[in-house]
């Protein structure tokens, strides 16, 4: 199994598996 490494704080993983900055989820 491939372990999915969590994205950095304030980032989320999109449907393509990329870590994308999450403006809404980061202490707005």
Curated annotation (Swiss-Prot):
GO terms for molecular function: potassium channel regulator activity; toxin activity. GO terms for cellular component: extracellular region; nematocyst. The keyword Disulfide bond applies. Signal peptide: none annotated. Disulfide bonds join 7-19, 10-26. It comes from the Eukaryota. Its main location: secreted. The keyword Membrane does not apply. Keywords: Disulfide bond, Ion channel impairing toxin, Nematocyst, Potassium channel impairing toxin, Secreted, Toxin, Voltage-gated potassium channel impairing toxin. It is found in: Secreted; Nematocyst. Possible voltage-gated potassium channel (Kv) blocker. Increases amplitude and duration of crab leg nerve compound action potential. Belongs to the sea anemone BBH family. This is Toxin Bcg III 23.41. The lineage of its organism: Eukaryota, Metazoa, Cnidaria, Anthozoa, Hexacorallia.
